[in-house]
Amino acid sequence: MRFAVLFLSISVPATAQTGTLTIYSILHAVGEERYQIEPSEGALKLSTTFEYTDRGNKRTTTADLKMTGDYTPLSLEIQGRPTDVHVQAGSATVKEDTAARTFATPEKYFAIFGPSPFAVQMMLIRYWNAHGRPAHLPILRARADATPLEIELVGHDSIAVRGAMVTLDRYTIANLMFGREILWMNSNGDLAAAMTFAGGLPMEAVRTEYQSAFPQLYRSGVSQELRNLQAIGKLAPPKRTGSFAIVGARMVDATGNPPVNDSVVIVRDGRIAAAGARASITIPNDMAIVDAKGQTLLPGLWEMHIHASGVEFGPALLASG
């Protein structure tokens, strides 16, 4: 599937651009972000302030991102976190907490440390579109093994704003944090909305003038996450589907009873139909057998108070046991 996107010229704007985003946590408005993009010494400068209240605690982060006219980062300074990036003559110096590194910049790159402030992500998408939409985009980090970002244009959404229809481009971003974020951009290259996570809990941002469409965008984002989950499932398909018996494992059933050393678990259409000692379970003659001798089996799920904020958390937690 191919998508067409229209963007304005990437020349340096003659006047300042401003915007305000309303910040949500678990669908409750908790703060806002205010940003300004203006010419600065022949280049661009983004200044943004991100403020929100979390359980009575007010948190403020400010960022200054300087870029060339094609959105290539020259420096990024974030107050509220001990992080900064400076690029000069093809060399980048990055400081994160107590770590620091100086290295040659790749051919294409961006400077960003996490989901917020959201205006930095807006400039990330502008850079990505202006530089040929690379499949893997390196980010300047103190860690040499930082995973490149994977950005995809995955669809479009149309929303009604003051009686007019506005078409937004929907993106996913992987490797900025665990899982994939979802972002929407308008035709001017402005951030319309974003869905991400903070502290294991959902966090959203929406352009203030688009607030009336937030419920629609949120539903679209959830649908996109389910499509992301389907794609993950294809990467690691189950070894067995339908009906089968898992035989011979040491079963721990979380009831407080001693483990069952020679167990049988009957699965029918993805659900556990029976589980217990081999002597107590009858295996149908025509049922496929999975030999689990020497392994430990935990049938079902244990609730251990996890924050499964994104669809990627489920497969990752299952894979880790």
List where the protein language model places each region.
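N-terminal, post-signal-peptide region of Sec/Tat-exported proteins
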Residues: 35-70
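Histidine-rich, glycine-flanked metal-binding segment
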Residues: 257-298
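Bacterial N-terminal signal peptides
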Residues: 2-13
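Extracellular/periplasmic ectodomains of large secreted or surface enzymes and adhesion receptors
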Residues: 205-248, 282-283
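Short, hydrophobic/aromatic-rich segments at coil-to-beta transitions
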Residues: 16-22, 40-47, 68-77, 90-93, ...
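Contiguous hydrophobic, core-forming segments of folded domains
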Residues: 56-122, 177-188, 192-204
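Solvent-exposed helix/loop surface patches that form functional interfaces
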Residues: 30, 82-168, 215-225
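Metal-associated gating/positioning segment near the N- to mid-region
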Residues: 287, 293-321
